[in-house]
Each structure stands twice: as C-alpha cells, then as structure tokens.
Amino acid sequence: KFADENFQLKH
C-alpha cells in the first residue's frame, strides 16, 4: 500500500 506508508510516515 502507499496510503499505509504515508500514514506511518505522517505519524
């Protein structure tokens, strides 16, 4: 996924 990675990066 890309959204999952984005979420982890954002948090």
UniProtKB/Swiss-Prot annotation:
EC identifiers of the protein: 5.2.1.8
Major subcellular site: cytoplasm
Residue intervals of the PPIase cyclophilin-type domain: 1-11
Catalytically driven reaction(s): [protein]-peptidylproline (omega=180) = [protein]-peptidylproline (omega=0)
Location in the cell: Cytoplasm
Keywords: Allergen, Cytoplasm, Isomerase, Rotamase
KW Coiled coil (keyword) present: no
Notes on how activity is controlled: Binds cyclosporin A (CsA). CsA mediates some of its effects via an inhibitory action on PPIase.
One GO CC term on file: cytoplasm
GO molecular function term, any single one: peptidyl-prolyl cis-trans isomerase activity
Keyword presence, Cell wall biogenesis/degradation: no
Disulphide bonds in the chain: none
Role played: PPIases accelerate the folding of proteins. It catalyzes the cis-trans isomerization of proline imidic peptide bonds in oligopeptides.
Entry similarity comment: Belongs to the cyclophilin-type PPIase family.
Protein name in the entry: Peptidyl-prolyl cis-trans isomerase
Gene source species: Penicillium glabrum (Penicillium frequentans)
